[in-house]
């Protein structure tokens, strides 16, 4: 079964996010548990935590289908010691907030070398940051997002993700989130069924589907292999509908949060409905195969 939603607002308190997900017909969602453009935030109150859990239950959404995103300020591969420690502290705080809310996943961008250290050293530093975070906060799984490779951001090659995972001590607490726009901009073609099969086979060979914990479903304003991160509404960009139809019909993408970050929020309900229709067709075809 497919679990599809969007990165919804948590304005007024994290407890509002499940309600906002229900309003667009979602059975999964993403959120920020604090202001993503500030280093520090007030601690979550007991009232807010309890209300979030209650609203999540009322929404009929399981915690494992929620994909929180950390602050954009965090750089777990920062080349400078003071800034690295600041990022690590903020990341541990983000993990702690997820634990308080009963959420088992935290999605994050890996980091940037800022032209001050070698990319390989930066990737190793990111893995070290993850290991330290795991030692500080129990249980929550750290989910590395692939990037478009804009600027000095790492994580745009599947090999980057694999190198980080290889250096993480507790493999049960690391996974990846693949953003379709980022992958396309980084040189992984998704425009046809054949292209999807090739790109996803490469992902499976280098990283492995066992590490896929979530996805961001975005079309791309940016050109193929441009290394530019520009999202677009589904079907309105340079990727097109075929990539998303492919995902909906492939059971390797079952039971993980599939999250829209597309640019026109007024289209989210329509986009979710269309994806869900393809998913239902795939499920019916699978059931027909089982009974024949």
Curated annotation (Swiss-Prot):
Kindly list the positions annotated as binding Zn(2+) 2. 145, 179, 216, 261
Q: Could you tell me what the cofactor note in this record states?
A: Binds 3 Zn(2+) ions.
E.C. numbers = 3.1.21.2
What Pfam family is a match, any one?
AP_endonuc_2
Necessary cofactors: Zn(2+)
InterPro entries in UniProt: AP_endonuc_2, AP_endonuc_F2_Zn_BS, Xyl_isomerase-like_sf, Xyl_isomerase-like_TIM-brl
| Catalytic reactions on record | Endonucleolytic cleavage to 5'-phosphooligonucleotide end-products
Among the GO biological process terms of this entry, one is: base-excision repair
Q: Which domain of life is it from?
A: Bacteria
Residues binding Zn(2+) 3, per UniProt: 182, 229, 231
Q: Tell me a Gene Ontology molecular-function term this record carries.
A: DNA binding
Sorted keywords for this record are:
DNA damage, DNA repair, Endonuclease, Hydrolase, Metal-binding, Nuclease, Zinc
Q: Which family does it belong to?
A: Belongs to the AP endonuclease 2 family.
Tell me the function of this protein. Endonuclease IV plays a role in DNA repair. It cleaves phosphodiester bonds at apurinic or apyrimidinic (AP) sites, generating a 3'-hydroxyl group and a 5'-terminal sugar phosphate.
Q: What PANTHER family does the record point to?
A: APURINIC-APYRIMIDINIC ENDONUCLEASE, ENDONUCLEASE IV ENDODEOXYRIBONUCLEASE IV
Name of this protein: Probable endonuclease 4
């Amino acid at each position: 079964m497919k679990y599809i939603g969007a990165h919804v607002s948590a304005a007024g308190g994290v407890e509002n996010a499940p309600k906002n997900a229900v309003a667009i017909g979602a059975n999964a969602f993403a959120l920020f548990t604090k202001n993503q453009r500030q280093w520090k935030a007030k601690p979550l109150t007991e009232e807010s935590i309890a209300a979030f859990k209650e609203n999540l239950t009322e929404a009929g959404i399981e915690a494992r289908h929620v994909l929180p995103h950390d602050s954009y300020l965090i750089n777990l591969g920062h080349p400078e010691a003071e800034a690295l420690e600041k990022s690590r502290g903020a990341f541990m705080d983000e993990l702690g907030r997820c634990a308080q809310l009963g959420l088992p996943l935290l999605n994050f961008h890996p980091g940037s070398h800022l032209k001050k250290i070698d990319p390989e050293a930066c990737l190793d530093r990111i893995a070290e940051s993850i290991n330290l975070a795991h030692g500080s906060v129990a249980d929550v799984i750290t989910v590395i997002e692939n990037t478009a490779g804009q600027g000095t951001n790492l994580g745009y090659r599947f090999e980057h993700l694999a190198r980080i995972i290889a250096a993480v001590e507790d493999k049960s607490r690391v996974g990846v989130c693949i953003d379709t726009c980022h992958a396309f901009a980084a040189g992984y073609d998704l425009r046809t069924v054949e292209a999807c099969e090739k790109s996803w086979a490469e992902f499976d060979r280098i990283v492995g589907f066992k590490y896929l914990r979530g996805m961001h479903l975005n079309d791309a304003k940016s050109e193929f292999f441009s290394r530019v991160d520009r999202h677009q509404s589904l079907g309105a960009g340079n990727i097109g509908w075929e990539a998303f139809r492919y995902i909906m019909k492939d059971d390797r993408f079952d039971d993980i949060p599939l999250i829209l970050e597309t640019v026109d929020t007024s289209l989210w309900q329509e986009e979710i409905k269309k994806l869900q229709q393809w998913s239902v067709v795939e499920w019916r075809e699978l059931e027909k195969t089982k009974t024949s």
